Amino acid sequence: MPISFEIYRDGQRVTQFTPVNPVALGPESVPIPGEIVFENGHLSIVRTDEHALGIALLWDLGPQGCYHLETTRLQPRPTPYNLNVELARSRLMKIIQKQEDWNLFDFPRADQFAAMFRDAQNLFSDALGKLHEPVEAAALADRSLAIAVDLSEQLANFHGELLLNRRRASGSIPKHVFGCRVDSTVQNQRYKDTLAEHFDYAVLPMSWKQVQPEEETFVTDPVDEWIEHLTRKRIPIVAGPLIDFSDGGMPDWSFIWEHDFDTLRELAYEFVQKMVHRYRKAVSVWNVVSAMHTSYHFTLTYEQIIELTRLLVSQVKTLLPAAKTLVTITQPFGEYHARGHTSMPPMFYADMVAQAGVNFDAFGLEVAIGVPTSGSYARDLFQLSCMLDKFSTTGRPVFLTAVAVPDRNQPDSNDRSEGKLNPSDAGRWHRPWDPQLQAEWMEAIYRLALSKPFVESVAWADLADINPSIPGSGLLDDMLKPKPSFKKLQELREQFHRKR
């Protein structure tokens, strides 16, 4: 029996609907495989079992934004649920949970939020009383959800500022906080000087695909030049990821060994050994593996994923016992896991690695929001704060190694997708993306991230709009002129260094 929903918009039941990025959810909001279809006026989750499931999809809230929202888990039943009501129910439940987690129920200055919550709760109660009149119930639920999303963002910001002030007062914010990932193929001197003069450290990619495009060919000149420049300027370097299992991250020739784990393991081991030996005197932190949990093109078992992670991290530690090592999580919302391949949910992988005796020092974390790819649909600040909180139980610090949002609401022919990614298809944070909104989002997420005691640093994903990872995500434009986001980042850096 499927779990189905009726959808209401503008006072009418929707009879034609194309869900955007719909995902079935299991326990702990973990995405799981499941067919989601809209037919005969119902949005349905179809699976062979009859477990309780939730659904997440892009949902437009009008002036507040358009976010990837979720329902609670619901039991299969013959009659459909009201999707509007279930989305409101889920957000109100999460607010209660996080208020408890954040100890805000009895916090004196949190009283200002109680009235908003009562309003949202009362509207939701009214909606439950009108379930026999679904159009009216949906309208009440929509109003409740709008208040709840606004309230939850305010709560996330309020809690973040509380923790950030405590962290700054205690002097526990590290010295090297503000970094930026560079494109080593860019050898422009102004580009290099901007990085060296305006950031605490550099994230220097040196992936297997980039350095060894052919099995017997090593191309290290671009990386060598960057290493020399950064070393001369005394800029700390986070190198890697060395082995990147994300989509497009592995060398094309490596797919020959897709079903030969032993050979793949040996080749990866040799590559890591060469890179660490070559740059051992220059690199401060080694980002050893990334996206291992997504298993995009390699059908690895859970045991093989953990074994390869352990082997490669141990290799770095054997060569450089004092080196700091990262294991990087990408797509932290885990939507890739709904594909049904041999992937691992992000936090399951994080917990497994942390508990399996892998001798690594910290997690790396990549967060890209605002493009229509798996894991990058728009989320509000409350959702991002909740995601970060999950890492608090791993017992490891977190380095945000690549954070990005677009500065435009249309495709960018110069980005790595060559114009295939359109931010307008991925939702919006309050309003359509523009350069000023990019700067506002940056300030909000940096303050939120650095309020978490376990977050040690944050690096922006793209220095300039020269082959950026997503449309217009650079801090400089393609002529290397500063954008509002660059200026905002320098203001933040000055504030933190002055008051640290």
Question: Predicted regions span which residues?
Answer:
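Long, charged/polar, soluble alpha-helical segments
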Residues: M1-T194
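Alpha-helix N-cap and loop-to-helix initiation/capping positions
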Residues: E136, L140, E215-P222, I256-L267, ...
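A eukaryotic intrinsically disordered, low-complexity regulatory tract that is acidic and Ser/Pro-rich
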Residues: S170-P174, G179-T185, Q189, D193-T194, ...
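Aromatic-lined carbohydrate-recognition surfaces of secreted/lumenal glycan-active proteins
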Residues: P174-V182, V288, T309-M344, R396-N409, ...
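Short, acidic/polar
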Residues: D183-A196, R265-M275, G340-V353, A439-L448
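Aromatic- and acid-rich polysaccharide-binding/catalytic face
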Residues: A196-E214, Y279-S290, T294, A323-F333, ...
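Substrate-binding cleft and catalytic face of glycoside hydrolase catalytic domains
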Residues: E197, Y201-P213, D224-G334, Q410
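Aromatic-rich peripheral "rim/lid" segments of glycoside hydrolase catalytic domains that contact
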Residues: R278, N287, M292-L311, Q315, ...
